[in-house]
Amino acid sequence: MTQPPRPTRLAQPTQPTQLPWPPERAEPTPPPELVQRAQPTPPLPPTEAPAGRERARPPQAPRPVRAPQAPPGGRLSPARPLRIAVVGGGPGGLYAAALLRRLTPGPEVTVWERNAPDDTFGFGVVLSDETLGGIEHADPAVYAALREDFVRWDDIDVVHRGRTLTSGGHGFAALGRRRLLRILHERCRALGVRLNFRTHAPPAAELARSYDLVIAADGVHSATRQDCADVFGTRLTTHRCRYIWLSADFAFDAFRFEVAETEHGVLQLHGYPYAPDASTVIVEAREEVWRRAGLDRLDERESTRRCAELFADALGGRPLRGNRSQWTAFRTVVNERWWHGNTVLLGDAAHTAHFSIGSGTKLAMEDAVALADHLASCLANHPAGHLADHRQDRSSVSEALAAYEAERRPAVESTQRAARASLEWFENLALYVDQPPRRFAFNLLTRSRRVTHDNLRLRDAAFVTAVEREAELPPDTPPMFTPFRLRGLTLRNRVVVSPMDMYSAQDGTPGDFHLVHLGARALGGAGLVMTEMVCVSPEGRITPGCTGLYADVHEGVWRRVVEFAHDASPGTALGVQLGHSGRKGSTRLMWEGMDDPLPRGNWPLAAPSPLPYRRGVSQVPQALDTAGLAAVREQFVAAARRAARAGFDLLELHCAHGYLLSSFLSPLTNHRTDAYGGTLAARLRYPLEVFDAVREVWPADSPMTVRISATDWAEGGTTADDAVAVAAAFAAHGADAVDVSTGQVVPDERPDFGRSYQTPYADRIRNELGVPVIAVGAISSWDDVNSLLLAGRVDLCALGRPHLYDPHWTLHAAAEQGYTGPGAPWPLPYRAGSRRPPTGRADGR
């Protein structure tokens, strides 16, 4: 039965009777707002909708905008003031105009907006504490007006199959988009900004000739950006879901996520209040679900009615309303550069971030603060902030624009990475709906990797404890210190020392370096310690310094390493990774020039196709014929037998990073026309033959894993869908887990680097196939490990560089979390160091 929402917990704002500022200084009366009337153009679809801020640390306010001062004892320069054109009258453009006009003495600022003053295509806007701190420093008057209208709340409700799970301590603030625009309109008028509504801006090239600075704040469909897309290096990505932006005439009492499981598939609702009597409601579904449900055939009125029916419980039976709302697919905008000459992109014109992580309004207003700050610095270098010489003008403006982009780009790219993770989580929502309810809620809250296990515990310890209890974690046991079983091997914890090439062998023979290196990591507490890629033949080495298992002497030395680890750190498992370099072999040691050919002493290379790794630089490999394929397969078998006799606990087949078996899998490196090339099934044939041959001689009770590159990060290469098919094939042939890496297959790849950036690929394989996965790639903290495990995205986490920085990373993680259980036992000789050493007191006592 439909239930009305529970009583609101919102703070009720007071409604100001007027905006809190008089004109700041005597100004000439600005020209009329509507200097040029034009027919309104059809509105564009909404490009973003706000969502909950995900905060991992206390907010830090940006620097205040600096107003340049006249030289001591000097007079104002008679030179003309700066002339600034702003294309687009959304919040970002308006706020930039107001901030720039506040510079002393103020530039001439003109804004063009093609729509009417009250036209807006969304409802509410969420701004974070960080953004509000920047606004307060940059313009206290705007902050004071916003503060009067904000509604605030702390909770997130996740509704999963009829159960509402609430997590508190998050902290949100929102207000209506129309109210925000009104505040900014009045602020611009008070400061003397020229506002032109229902008016198309002149072409950007024309503006650039007559103005010192042109700010393109004209949104995701920016005409300014499109006119110079090649200069800005624009990349547009349209995503898999359709969404519609609606409103309800009541206030949710929390940020609400709700899932509707229908005969057509899964749809989701994102809802939050933006006024005491109004909420934003966004309904979203994958494209195929949207079409199967017939939503693609409905107009705005029918779409609104249908969405209200789908989420009647969430709405308490109330209706929804639109505002020229239409279904659209979110588009991510990325630009290689944000400015050209004296024209700069701001807000959605420069970058977009999916509404499930943060609003474009938030990013645009932060852009405005940074741009005004750097332009103030530019003007401070000129007498009284005026510009006189045209060439000097443009040079100084260019310096300011370069500084603006340098400051903002890292923050924006970080937000876009988090937004990409979040939107992909919602695209794949159907993979998670069968999770237990609390795990599902935890997974949703940590989807972007910005909110973590430890951070969420700080916000709502009771919620995290309930999630851990549902997952049947032993009391006081972090997720990373729970055991995991692979075939006959039980790992004492979920931490893996990732394979890392050391380039320190002689003729394939490991030495004392490897004993100390791997022995130290075994003593450091990880559940599984992996060797570097161990090569199956002399010709299969990457460099002369790579280890092998192609000679009896190798077997004996590896046995010494394994026995030391087992004896010195009982419970540690040692794994060997077997591989063949393929076309990436016969190169220098990494620190001498990675992927550079040897200057002398080269050996012949083999690959599926005669394609060099770096055209014109690398050696051209020989395409393997039938005899060559059989010979390499037997080399893997012989190395596996030696690995078993050496006592390794686990064997991993290296089918990633562009080495031999990987280059069979990728269409970019496999151009064969025989049975081993063409379709994905054909490209899989040889790696599977090698896997089967190794599995046959590897002890039946010992696990085998396979490492794959889940994407080539290059057009025409392996895709995420391909990776699922590859993982499924290896699992069907007996792989006990898939080690999911990415890239390094072609030199012109474009990886999307970032914190734990490869884990979504592992997540999808695990939850789509039910196959255990090892996640790897920029996982650097124990908090990340706990978050990924408790959310059910991965089974094991492999860390490389953190274990180079700290061989005892796992034991130190246990000490920092106060864990002393069986998942991380300290070796007896080290037990005295199991507590963090005391540090000096600040008072010197």
For the regions a protein language model found, what residue spans apply to each?
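Conserved mid-domain beta->alpha element of the FAD-binding
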Residues: 86-99, 215-216, 326-421
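Extreme N-terminal leader/targeting segments of oxidoreductases
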Residues: 1-9, 19-21, 34, 46-84, ...
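Conserved N-terminal glycine-rich FAD pyrophosphate-binding loop of Rossmann-like flavoproteins
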Residues: 116-134
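Flavin-dependent oxidoreductase catalytic cores
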Residues: 460-845
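Glycine-rich FAD pyrophosphate-binding loop
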Residues: 101-121
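C-terminal helical "tail/cap" subdomain of flavin- and related membrane-associated enzymes
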Residues: 74-81, 143, 376-472
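Conserved FAD/dinucleotide-binding core of flavoprotein oxidoreductases
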Residues: 163-170, 176, 191, 253-334, ...
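Conserved N-terminal helical subregion
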Residues: 75-82, 129-245, 463-465
